[in-house]
Amino acid sequence: MIIFVMKKIFFITPVQIILLSFLLFNCQAQQTTNASLEEAKKAIAASNEIYFQAFAKGDSSIFIDRYAKDCWIMPPNAPTLCGVDAPHEFFKTAYNKFGLRNGKFITVDVFGDGVEFVTEEGFWQSFDADNKLFDNGKFLVLWKKTPDGWKMFRDSFSSDRNK
């Protein structure tokens, strides 16, 4: 292929054409991935904003709706809870046994391709009925894009306090 630019002749080989098209395609794919990741970040922030309302209102359905049907919840010093009943079991324990009534997530980062899965890392705080901090720690959550939106697929967290 011959290209004329300002009275100069440039020859472009098939290899150069392939490399140029790959470069352009890669830039477009990167923009799509960035848009998907931003969409995931917004959905996660919205989910996190209402997560602890479940405990403040005593409404497990708000909590359960944050999780994928095939989720795993991996709390500290306890067995892993798996499947559709895992969120309800965790809610009952946190609400009744530990007196969780409110909390806060502090997201440090969300990373991944934003297409099927993303990972969120951060810190959490748990408060009792008197709004007293009784536990805090860190978390890693693998989020999964489902037909119902972004849901927690693997939720692993640990406490910064002694048992």
Show which residues each predicted segment covers.
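Bacterial Sec-dependent N-terminal signal peptides
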Residues: 1-35
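Short, low-complexity N-terminal intrinsically disordered segments enriched in polar/charged residues
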Residues: 13, 27-65, 69
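Hydrophobic pocket/interface hotspot
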Residues: 51, 59, 63-64, 71, ...
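A short gly/proline-enriched turn/hairpin at secondary-structure junctions
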Residues: 66, 71-82, 93-98
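A mature extracytoplasmic/lumenal domain signature
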Residues: 67, 77, 122-124, 156
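Surface-exposed, charged secondary-structure patches
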Residues: 89-129
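Solvent-exposed, non-transmembrane alpha-helical starts
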Residues: 131-133
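Short beta-strand edge/turn micro-motifs at domain boundaries
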Residues: 136-161
